[in-house]
Amino acid sequence: MVLNYIWIAFFVIAFVIAVVKLLFMGDFEVFPAMMDSTFASSKTAFEISLGLTGVLSLWLGIMKIGEKGGVVNALARLLSPVFVRLFPEIPKGHPVTGSIFMNIAANMLGLDNAATPLGLKAMEQLQDLNKKKDTASNPMIMFLVLNTSGLTLIPVSIMVYRAQMGAAQPTDIFVPILLATFFSTLAGIIITSLYQRINLFNLTMLLTLGGACVLVSAIIWGFSQMDKDQVNIVSTTVANILLMLIIIGFILSGVRHKVNVYDAFIEGAKDGFQTAVRIIPYLVAILVGIGVFRASGAMDMLIDGIKWTVAAVGGDTDFVGALPTALMKPLSGSGARGMMVDAMTTYGADSFIGRLSCVFQGSTDTTFYILAVYFGSVGIRYTRHAVACGLLADLAGILSAIAICYMFF
């Protein structure tokens, strides 16, 4: 519903601005430019979708091997000591804990098709424990915030788009996304725990969160000692090594569990073509809307206004061109994806804005969409502090993404 209003606004605002330009500024080129943008954007959307097929097939095949090889179960077992303490109101041994762990693990691996059904199942089980059926319980809210913070280990789709848009090193945003999504998730956990008065000062949580913070701090300190060329070389090398280790690990896990690895890969890869075809209408819709909005001059007005505000308080304005992706992400995943593609098309996949828009896309998730789907599935009407916690986690992800990208790029 939100995306519907945004899409309408793209056209209405663009039309109003174009009429003003025509009548009061004598700009006879604005309407031809807007119409040309609709054709160019439609063509771009189709070409991008077509080009995604091969890389999508590759990674969906690899993910299927990991899924059948028990990687999700292994990750769920690894996470269980931490998440048990984040959900103190859930009775020990209740089946919902398994669904929560599996959902978070699937999200971390980028297995959206598996994560959503597991998430809906977890929400139904949490509703069974909920005493006020129309009001979100504390475990529900913590679960939602963990989903909206966008914690991910493998940002496959973003790397795929970067490859299609001609990035020299599509994986160069891998480490920045890991760092930004860590801060987003950490902020979400801390903020929600403060609301719910969950004690994070126990040995397990201190060791886990403290250890993660030390590791991330060490990574940031290490990169801060290098110049930007060294940062780019090291981060790209590390990202590619990690991704290769993930592929090898998934294959070995499949072999260990006696999975026919080749058949599993083919089964998953088949979904690549279907996924690429399925996103064509969505990508056409959002890119055409953004194209018209940009061709009318409305996007430049928006960005220039934000730049003026940032400059007025003495801030650097290099990041402003990527902000439309960050602002769209809590509202719509497809809308933010369109903004990311538009930024790479306009400024270049290897530009600072192009890279930052990709990190924005990977550091948080679609807060309002997740709230609508998960809470709507069980009839929750009163969300309590869920929206506030989710949006604050998003804000932490956005701010950390900006800081990290200045360091890396």
Q: Could you say what each language-model-derived stretch is?
A:
Residues F101, A105, M140, V231-V234, ...:
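Generic signal for short, ordered secondary-structure residues
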